[in-house]
UniProtKB/Swiss-Prot annotation:
Catalytic activity entry: a fatty acyl-[ACP] + phosphate = an acyl phosphate + holo-[ACP]
Disulfide bonds: none
PANTHER family the record matches: FATTY ACID/PHOSPHOLIPID SYNTHESIS PROTEIN PLSX, PHOSPHATE ACYLTRANSFERASE
Domain of life where this protein originates: Bacteria
GO biological process: fatty acid biosynthetic process; phospholipid biosynthetic process
UniProt keywords, alphabetically: Cytoplasm, Lipid biosynthesis, Lipid metabolism, Phospholipid biosynthesis, Phospholipid metabolism, Transferase
Organism of this sequence: Bartonella quintana (strain Toulouse)
Gene3D superfamilies, per the entry: Isopropylmalate Dehydrogenase
Protein name as catalogued: Phosphate acyltransferase
Family: Belongs to the PlsX family.
HAMAP family: PlsX (MF_00019)
Protein location: Cytoplasm
Record SUPFAM superfamilies: Isocitrate/Isopropylmalate dehydrogenase-like
Length: 357
């Protein structure tokens, strides 16, 4: 039985989406047990709607929950030992749960997870990895917003962790990895990116195949399985892609309603449009993974509906059942055993100061 703790209060729709999402998963994955954390008056009425969860879940009442507009430091100070998000994370630390999921405040989730679970000894810094729909299938992109800036060593860490996540989700022996850069030529880019590329190219780390630099317009093509960048660039790329997808949808909707013949054309092509909508649906690939921590923590989109939250639960299930943490720990250990040989002894320049978003 895989145990998953859920911050029921997180996200735009709260218990209505999170508990309903758990009920969807229960139909297909009966070997999952849920620990629901939330405020009594908000959770209990919703739980009554899903008797199918009665024997496969436990509700744990909390004093408060983390608001979406709270700063990470404020959320940590106010929520420690009180909020539904904190208790869901702490359940992983205490061994009561194998993974934690929240659709709540990203900064707060990152801060609480870092404070409660601590970093893997083998990892320098956490990263958030997201699943990105592409022309081929899906790619893993990281870091999409855990921290700003990265050294060459930290970028290699992200490559190792991202490849481990891709192997876990898609059962590919050696995922292809690319570093996001301003060009594909080896002479382009900041020092940290070029240095990380040199290391990945020369060392040939087990468990991944380095393909070189990729540009922003390559992400959606799916030319590599894993795209690695620091959190500032990654977050901008993510938000740009999401905004572009929404804009295309709005333009298409307006165009299809502009005339009788446009509407007729849509009617005749509706199968193709359904395929496009399914491919680009953010709920289908919902579930960012916080990598580098001593535990599995999944961040769902705050706007996710029940179906989207169910997708995030399935990601957590795959991470646990396929041993994500063991794979990443072993891969990082192999890299760091040779780290002194790979990097210059002087301090590495970083892309910037490594601030937290």
């Amino acid at each position: 039985m895989i145990r998953i703790s859920v911050d029921v209060m997180g996200g735009d729709y709260g218990p209505e989406a999170t508990i309903a999402g758990a009920a969807i998963v229960q139909k297909h994955l009966p070997n999952v047990y849920f620990l629901f954390y939330g405020v009594d008056e908000a959770v209990k009425p919703v739980l009554k709607k899903y008797p199918c969860l009665a024997s496969l879940s436990r509700f744990c009442s909390t004093e408060s929950y983390t608001r979406m507009d709270e700063k990470p430091s404020q959320a940590l100070r106010n929520g420690r030992g009180r909020s539904s998000m904190w208790y869901a994370i702490e359940a992983v630390k205490n061994g009561e749960a194998d993974a934690c999921i929240s659709a709540g405040n990203t900064g707060a989730l990152m801060a609480m997870s870092y404070f409660c679970l601590k970093m893997m000894a083998e990892a320098e810094r956490p990263g958030i990895a997201g699943i990105w729909p592409t022309l081929r299938s899906e790619s893993v992109v990281l870091d999409i917003g855990a921290t700003i800036g990265a050294s060459a060593s930290q970028l290699v860490d992200l490559a190792v962790m991202g490849a481990g996540m891709f192997r876990t989700l898609y059962h590919t022996e050696k995922p292809s990895v690319g570093l996001l850069n301003v060009g594909v030529e080896e002479v382009k880019g900041l020092y940290a990116i070029k240095k990380a590329g040199m290391i990945l190219r020369e060392v040939q780390l087990e468990g991944l195949e380095y393909k070189g630099f990729v540009e922003g317009n390559d992400i959606g093509k799916g030319i590599v399985d894993v795209v690695v960048t620091e959190g500032f660039s990654g977050n901008i790329a993510l938000k740009t892609a999401e905004g572009t997808a929404r804009q295309i949808g709005e333009i298409l909707n307006a165009a299809m309603r502009s005339s009788f013949f446009s509407s007729l054309g849509y009617f005749l092509s509706r199968g193709a449009f359904r395929t496009l909508r399914h491919k680009m649906d953010p709920d289908r690939v919902n579930g960012g993974v916080l990598l580098g921590l001593n535990g599995v923590v999944i961040k769902s989109h705050g706007s996710a509906n029940a179906s989207g939250f169910a997708s995030a639960i399935r990601v957590a299930y795959e991470m646990v059942s396929n041993g994500l943490l063991k794979k990443i720990t072993a891969d990082l250990r192999r890299f760091h055993e040779n780290k002194e040989k790979l990097f210059d002894k002087e301090s590495e320049p970083t892309i910037n100061n490594g601030e937290t978003i």
